[in-house]
Amino acid sequence: MATRVRPIDRRAFLTGLAGIAAGVAVDAPSLAAGPLQSALFDLDQQFFASAQKKPDGRYAISILDDVGQELAQVGLPDRGHGIAVSPDRQTLIAFARRPGTFALIIRPFDGSEPKLISAIKGRHFYGHGCFSGDGRLMYAVENDYEVGRGIIGIYDLSGRKATRIGEFETFGIGPHEILLSSDQKTLIVANGGILTHPAKPREKLNLETMAPSIVFLDAATGDLITQHQIALHLHQLSLRHMTQDATGRVWIGGQFEGPETKTPPLVATCGKDTPLRLHDIPAKITSGLQNYIGSVTANRDGSVIATSAPRGGKVLFWKADTMNFIGAQSIPDGCGISPIDQQSFLISDGNGGLSFLDDSTGSPIVLARAPGTSWDNHMTAI
C-alpha cells in the first residue's frame, strides 16, 4: 500500500524527498503496461493529471501522485490542454489545445484502451470540458468557426463509444473553460471573446471588437440564465479560466489583449445573481505579470484561491470569503496548479518542474525536474 503523508509531516517529508528527486527524470510506465490498480493504493491517495510535451517532441498525459512521482503516461496525437474528471474519479477526458480536433477518454484505473473523440466537421475544441453530475454526459466547448460562435457539444458516454447527442450555444465567441455549478444544475462558461479560425491557427481576428463574458446556462436545456459582460473600456480582457470557492462564487482569470502599457486587474469574481467584480493586485506585482493569468483553482475547502501567472513567474493567492489578495510566491513559468489539501498545492511549470507550495506562506519546494519536458498549462486533481 502506498505510504501516505500526514499533513503535519508533509513539508518535512517533501523537503527530504526534493533533495533526492530534484533533477531526476523518472521513466514512468505507460498505461499499456498495466493499469493503476486501485487496490494497490490507499483509497484516500490523491492523483493528478497533466498534459506534457516530452523530450522527444511527442505529447502525452501523465498521471502523478501527491509527491510529484509520475506513475503512468498516455500518448496523445498532438498537444493537450485541459482535463475533465468524472464524478466517480474513474474517467478522464483530455482535450486538444485550440484549434485541435481530438479529445481522449482515459480510464487509468482499469487499463482499458483510451478512446478517441473527434470534433465534427466545421468545429474544433477549445481545450476544456466538464461532466454532468451523474457522469453520463460530457460538455465540450467548441468553435463553430465558419459562423464564428461558441458552442457546447454534448456527448453521451454511457455506450461503448462517445456519441454526440446535441449542442448548446454559449452566447459568445471563443468559449474557453466550462464548469458545472456546485448544485449540478448550471453550466458556467467563460467566453474569452476572441474570434479565431483554424486556417490561421493562432491568429486573433477581432481584438478591436472583443466582447468577453461569463454566462450561466441551464444544464438541462441550454437556456441562458445570466450573462455578465465586462466593462466596455476593458473589453480586451479575455476571460479564460475559472474555479468556484466554498460558497459557489466563480473566480475568473483574464488575459489582456490590449496595449502593453496598460495593466488592468486580471482576476474577477461573479455569481449567477452577482455582477462581475475586478480585484486589484498590488502595483509592484501587477507590473511584472505581463497581463496574463494561466490557471485558477481553489484549495480543498474552497477558502483560498490560487491564480498562476506563468509569464510573470508568480502564483497569486486570495482569501475567498473577503476576496482580498493575500500574497504571492515565485515559480518561473509555473502555470498548472492543483490543490493537495486545505493549504497546499502541486504546481507544474514549463521547464519540467513539479513543486509543492504551502499557499502564500511557504517557499516552494521543487519535487522533481525532468530535463526536456514541458508541462502544459493545467494540473488537474483526479
Residues covered by each model-derived region:
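A short beta-strand motif characteristic of beta-propeller blades
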Residues: Q69-V74, P114-A119, T163-F168, I225-A231, ...
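Residue-level detector of Asp-centered blade-edge/turn motifs that repeat once per structural unit
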Residues: P87-D88, G133-D134, S182-D183, D245-T247, ...
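Blade-loop segments of beta-propeller domains
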Residues: V74-I105, D110-F131
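Repeated scaffold domains used in trafficking and secretory/extracellular systems
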Residues: R79-V85, H124-C130, I173-E177, Q236-H241, ...
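Beta-propeller blade signature
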Residues: I152-L157, E208-A219, P265-K272
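N-terminal secretory signal peptides and thylakoid transit peptides that target proteins
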Residues: A2-I20
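Short, conserved, GDST-rich strand-edge loop motifs in beta-rich repeat architectures
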Residues: V141-D144, V189-T209, G253-P264
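Asp-box/WD-like beta-propeller blade repeats and closely related beta-sheet repeat scaffolds
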Residues: I120-H128, V141-S181
